[in-house]
């Protein structure tokens, strides 16, 4: 995350590819913003939310933490977070409104969807804050993003297997979020390759496992959409 990095300390090798890193960040934000806008559009048409409940709460909580509690000094990055939080809240309200039809098989969930979503956000929010207090906001930002991505990718596949339904996901929705996340991987690769003193940990076994899990889960989901 640029906002937590002192670019004056970046090695010359990284400074030479910084333009490419910033391009990846731009397209990462663009991909996810397009995904959020499409989710709102589908919800307004009365279609179900394409994101499972826990990943939705987790995403909103993560964005809130790094918008309010640990805001990025990078104004462009902060603006992207504010836009993401705003759109995610619109998604949340749409999901709460459509809960009666989407969760008709669970009367308790259908009746108290709004309260359950708020409770889920609070739980995830405090978890992300606790992680930042434990390992520092710079590392917690990245690990929090990993948690959000895995919850979304694995949750989507589980939803597909359990309900035999994409839950409203379309090809455009999937491709925008997948490409946005792939741009984040490209950005992380440049950090690891050209700034190993600070970002060598991005090649740790757990990060590589998380990357492999994300790719397998999301590509599996994409193939299922085509079938």
Swiss-Prot record:
Protein name: Terpene cyclase ltmB
Function: Terpene cyclase; part of the gene cluster that mediates the biosynthesis of lolitrems, indole-diterpene mycotoxins that are potent tremorgens in mammals, and are synthesized by clavicipitaceous fungal endophytes in association with their grass hosts. The geranylgeranyl diphosphate (GGPP) synthase ltmG is proposed to catalyze the first step in lolitrem biosynthesis. LtmG catalyzes a series of iterative condensations of isopentenyl diphosphate (IPP) with dimethylallyl diphosphate (DMAPP), geranyl diphosphate (GPP), and farnesyl diphosphate (FPP), to form GGPP.
Top-level taxonomy: Eukaryota, Fungi, Dikarya, Ascomycota, Pezizomycotina
Topology within the bilayer: Multi-pass membrane protein
Localization (cell): Membrane
Induction remark: Expression is down-regulated when the stress-activated mitogen-activated protein kinase (sakA) is deleted.
GO MF term list: lyase activity
Keyword Secreted tagged: no
Main location: membrane
Gene encoding the protein: ltmB
Pathway given in the UniProt record: Secondary metabolite biosynthesis
Domain of life: Eukaryota
InterPro entries membership: PaxB-like (IPR039020)
Keywords carried by this UniProt record: Lyase, Membrane, Transmembrane, Transmembrane helix
EC number: 4.2.3.-
Originating organism: Epichloe festucae var. lolii
UniProt record similarity statement: Belongs to the paxB family.
GO annotations of cellular component type: membrane
The keyword Kinase is annotated on this UniProt entry: no
Annotated TM spans: 20-40, 51-71, 76-96, 113-133, 135-155, 173-195, 206-226
């Amino acid at each position: 995350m640029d906002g937590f990095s002192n670019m004056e300390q970046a090695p010359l090798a990284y400074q030479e590819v910084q333009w490419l890193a910033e391009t990846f960040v731009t397209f990462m934000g663009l991909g996810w913003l397009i995904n959020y806008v499409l989710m709102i559009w589908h919800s307004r048409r009365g279609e179900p939310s394409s994101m499972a409940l826990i990943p939705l709460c987790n995403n909103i909580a993560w964005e809130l933490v790094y918008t309010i509690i640990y805001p990025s000094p990078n104004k462009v990055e902060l603006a992207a977070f504010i836009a993401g939080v705003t759109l995610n809240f619109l998604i949340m309200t749409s999901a709460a409104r459509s809960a009666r039809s989407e969760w008709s098989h669970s009367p308790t969930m259908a009746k108290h969807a709004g309260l359950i979503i708020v409770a889920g956000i609070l739980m995830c929010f405090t978890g992300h804050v606790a992680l930042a207090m434990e390992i520092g906001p710079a590392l917690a930002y990245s690990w929090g993003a990993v948690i959000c991505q895995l919850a979304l990718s694995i949750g989507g596949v589980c939803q597909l297997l359990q309900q035999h339904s994409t839950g409203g996901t379309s090809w455009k929705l999937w491709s925008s979020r997948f490409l946005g996340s792939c741009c984040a991987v490209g950005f992380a690769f440049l950090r690891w390759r050209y700034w190993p003193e600070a970002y060598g940990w991005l090649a740790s076994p757990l990060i590589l496992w998380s990357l492999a899990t994300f790719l397998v889960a999301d590509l599996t989901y994409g193939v299922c959409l085509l079938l």
